[in-house]
Amino acid sequence: MQAVQQEIAQALKVQPPFADAAALEAEVARRVTFIKGCLANARLKTLVLGISGGVDSLTAALLAQRAINELRAETGDKAYTFIAVRLPYQVQHDEHDAQACLDVIKADEVHTVDIAPAVRALAAEVVELKNGSPTLVDFVVGNVKARTRMVAQYTIAGARAGLVIGTDHAAEAVMGFFTKFGDGACDLAPLSGLVKNQVRAIARSFGAPESLVEKVPTADLEDLEPGKPDEASHGVTYQQIDAFLHGQPVDQAAFDIIVATYRKTQHKRELPFAP
């Protein structure tokens, strides 16, 4: 492991690879306990999470629903609730995957909020977007989608006295692959410190089908490039990112991209600048 790999892995609190099935189950139990503790500390009984159809939100939701199930069993209090939220922009091209995720999660409640009217209304009011290039406008509006989704989740959480769950993990964090104050905003991040392969392994341990576990990851925020794979944006694969974070050798080109991207996106992982 090179020094910079160790530095980044420590900063992101990257967890070691699962040694075996028992280690995986112990990590699942630890993270479920973490979720339960967050609710106890906040003196709240509701969790809210947006379900995209990808493995990250699927895995976070499975952990959340298990935490809620355990709290109800332990306390006898039926007020504990997990709310899964679908947040499509009109009709999502992979809606069938999102519905398949919901079938696996079996959330206590499922809400759907179409973010398109809000996103379009805001975009129409911003003069700077009227003369921008199509590519720039598409990128900016893509971030508006992510932030609108988080506004919707916090609106539901506020109305139901709940906490919002985030889906960020180490393989996305190192690349700064989230929208600031969008999907990067949350009250708790139960996947933090995990690499992508570990997220998939946890989903698999819950019995999620391989079609969802191994689905090609996509943020799917840009209309001009619908379903664009994360890895196309990264310039490296998740396998390479995972290997880097676990201190394993990666080719020099991938190494340089990961380090440069980590440094360039440092501001996204920090609190706002202050004097």
From Swiss-Prot:
Positions with a binding annotation for Mg(2+): 56, 172
Any single GO BP term: NAD biosynthetic process
Similarity section: Belongs to the NAD synthetase family.
Protein name in UniProt: NH(3)-dependent NAD(+) synthetase
Top-level EC class: ligase
GO molecular function, one term: glutaminase activity
Annotated S-S bridges: none
Functional pathway: Cofactor biosynthesis; NAD(+) biosynthesis; NAD(+) from deamido-NAD(+) (ammonia route): step 1/1
Stored PANTHER family: NH 3 /GLUTAMINE-DEPENDENT NAD + SYNTHETASE (PTHR23090), NH(3)-DEPENDENT NAD(+) SYNTHETASE (PTHR23090:SF7)
Entry's Gene Ontology cellular component terms: cytoplasm
Keyword Ligase part of the UniProt annotation: yes
EC assignment: 6.3.1.5
Binding locations of ATP: 50-57, 167, 196, 218
Pfam families: NAD_synthase
Catalysed reaction equations from the record: deamido-NAD(+) + NH4(+) + ATP = AMP + diphosphate + NAD(+) + H(+)
Function: Catalyzes the ATP-dependent amidation of deamido-NAD to form NAD. Uses ammonia as a nitrogen source.
Entry binding sites for deamido-NAD(+): 147, 180, 187, 267-268
The protein's assembly and partners: Homodimer.
